[in-house]
């Protein structure tokens, strides 16, 4: 997270139109470095996008059990930064929100926090059993698979056929 702020500062000092993007999990928003970085990025109006991949669990603890404010994007307001929640399993929605945030940063308006609501289909680590997650919850999220949803949208919009998607 702080490395992205450093990259954003470098871009601003060099006068480029680059925007630094940092991707991190929901658990990282409970670390001091998240808050320190947002504060400095806001003060310096850095061209940065901070993307929270809210997959519902920090290790094996649900967000609602570890965060008094489960809307993690709302934390950005404390630093005068726009924060937005988006369906992280909707490729088009994520693209639109990220594009707007990048455009904002390029206009010199500073950073944005984008919280992508998604789900981790496996345990946190390869060796971890994910038995702490209810089976119904896992099944519900399987229905929201972003690859399948994008494929359906492409077909519905006449942009691709099922056969073309199979080849991909």
Regions found by a protein language model. Name each.
Residues 1-168:
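Glycine-rich ThDP/TPP pyrophosphate-binding loop and its adjacent helix/strand module
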